[in-house]
Amino acid sequence: IHMDYGILGSSDLDQASPFAAKLQTNLLLPLIYPVIRDGRFKSRLLQKRLTQRKSEMGGYVQAFMEMLGGARPYVTVQSCKNQFYSDLVTPLPDKINVPGTEIHIFYALKMGEKYRERYERHFANPVIHKQDLQHEELLACYPERWAQLVKDIMEGKR
């Protein structure tokens, strides 16, 4: 399979050892899975905190939650566990360079410099599109801009 373009978002490429990945999965899944399955946190404290964050951060948190798509009762906990864990333990080499493939990364500056360093470590020549935004804010809050950027990349304008 050959791709002309690879487009990644803000927090892709998280990695951990099998032990750390299992620990993260087992700690976070009970908190996150109810949001995926039911569209809301099971914990009243977390749901209250989400409500507070929605009022503090304007439309970003609401748009992000809407982007997640609401309740998905058909998604099993085992499926989420497998995806979360495998994302963390799948090895990724450094300085990937596939001739004829351009790697484009939508980099949310508000996530921090460590992400830029990660992109530059794993890809030989990534094209980094800096956005002065939060995690996935471009897609969640400005889908037209996101789509235009993807279109411009595909048409060779970026």
Map each language-model feature to its residues:
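Short, structured coil segments at secondary-structure junctions
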Residues: 2, 122-124
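Conserved alpha/beta-hydrolase catalytic His-Asp/Glu region
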Residues: 17, 37-96
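Conserved serine/cysteine hydrolase catalytic core
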Residues: 75-121, 138
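Catalytic histidine-centered segment of alpha/beta-hydrolase-like enzymes
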Residues: 131-147
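C-terminal alpha-helix
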Residues: 148-157
